[in-house]
Regions:
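Active-site-proximal helix-loop-helix substrate-binding element of RNase H-like nuclease domains
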Residues: 2-9, 51-178
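Short, flexible, glycine/charge-rich loop motifs used to bind or transfer phosphoryl groups or to couple energy/partner
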Residues: 17-19, 46, 84-88
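Short consensus segments that form the blades of beta-propeller domains
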Residues: 44-50
Length: 178
């Protein structure tokens, strides 16, 4: 059982109130956060029925949002309502960008959703562009190509306060710390 800390690290993050109209987007980036406890032993949860989607990040030029769905710490969107909205996005004919598309699209299919439009997988594209890179993580690619990285200091601070592993047990945190 996870003990809720008396004092939580501050966070300025707020969930988006709505998803903007994206029908004119030429490309949409999508990233799933998952709880996948058996991935190392029995394979991805989307194939084995073990685990679930914890949250979905969506980004287009000029807007980005993270939609928490199953964080044990609360602050979640209604899954059924969000799924209907996500289906509309996935039905758009524009390019969809994923990092490790096989994994994320597998989870979306397990949810009964289909991705329409071209799928671009940065995890596959990166070694084709530069086979001699040391790392192909999304953070490493963002740093090298966009001069941007994500700060995980808030995640690690919150995980320490909650007494959990920041990566393996991220789903136990309230959404604002992810």
């Amino acid at each position: 059982m996870t003990q809720i800390p008396l004092f939580q690290p501050p966070s300025e993050w707020l969930p988006p109130e709505t998803i903007p109209a994206l029908q004119n987007a030429s490309q949409i980036a999508i990233d799933l956060e998952t709880y996948d406890p058996g991935i190392k032993d029995i394979g991805p949860g989307w194939a084995t029925g073990n685990g679930r989607i914890i949250g979905v990040a969506i980004a287009v030029d000029g807007w980005q949002g993270y939609f928490p769905l199953h964080h044990q710490g609360g602050g979640n969107f209604d899954e059924k309502i969000f799924k209907r909205q996500l289906k509309k996005i996935l039905d758009l004919p524009c390019d969809k960008i994923f990092h490790n598309a096989t994994y994320d699209v597998g989870w979306l299919k397990q949810w009964g959703l289909e991705v329409k439009g071209r799928i671009i997988d940065t995890m596959i594209a990166a070694p084709l562009i530069d086979e001699n890179r040391f790392r192909y993580s999304l953070n490493a690619l963002g740093k090298d190509y966009l001069q941007e990285t994500k700060s995980e200091s808030g995640l690690y601070e919150a995980a320490k306060a909650w007494g959990i592993d920041p990566k393996a047990e991220m789903y136990k945190l309230p959404a604002q710390h992810v």
